[in-house]
Amino acid sequence: MVGSVLCKRLQTLDIPHLKLSRHPSLSSEDQVFWDPDERILETEKLREVETVIHLAGEPVGKRWTHEIKKKIIFSRSDAGRFLFETLAAQDKPPKTLISASGIGFYGVANETKFDEESAKGRGFLADVVEDWESAPEPLHKVGTRVVNMRMGVVLSPDGGALAKMLPVFKFGLGGTLGSGHQMMSWIAMEDLIRAIMFFIENETLQGIYNLVSPNAVSNVEFTTILGWVLKRPTLFPVPALALRVIFGEMAMQTILASQHVIPKKLLEAGFEFQYPELEQALKHCLGREKN
């Protein structure tokens, strides 16, 4: 989802770029075939690449069976590590790696506000993110600048949490999830893409950065604002018990989890959010700015 939007932005700006693809039939001048399961990568096309942006990862928004957990781990840590080890072994490794990560690192806390200096939390996602962020170490060792982006909920009608909510809310069946008090740290897709470009352009930036709006909201606030933007009622709450029964562990660490995360380092670096408030962000991504 993010990769497709980013590629369109790069194309608009006439910035040459290559896309990794798992489909050999799609291999072309701007496509690079790779199969991390079989440890295959078309390295000859990557010799002159200066910046690598790694965004791959199995979606976490489904019940976490044993097999799903294995896919979540492999797609982030193992596949990434294979890519980074291969790139690090080239005669000319890339100058910059910008890699996706997640705010799941911080675990769950009802009262705490997390910034980049906050300690690792507990749970499956916290462990996944810790391993995910260690995967670029081979590139770090050869001098590549590494940026790890701990992303919050990315607002897009084309994928992720918002895309799953929209059909329900449009039918007027939306409502709060659980108590509704849990904090949700989000970022507009436009600001995420702008932040990636910001990291590319500012070569002194490296390390961990939280990619979330400065203004986290509670689930009650999110529900109310989304209903208002769509001009639909939000009268059908979903009990926490139902979510736990349906989604199990995943519900406790995502849907019902409270995470109030602050983009401290990003703001200190001078980044300016175009959509820092939820209402304007939702209106933009849903094409309702004139309403």
Feature roles, as predicted:
Residues 81-123:
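Conserved Rossmann-fold NAD(P)-dependent oxidoreductase catalytic core, especially the SDR/UDP-sugar
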Residues 101, 134-157:
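Conserved beta-loop-beta element that borders a ligand/cofactor-binding pocket
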Residues 130, 142-144, 155-164, 199-209:
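Glycine/proline-rich active-site loop of Rossmann-fold NAD(P)-dependent oxidoreductases
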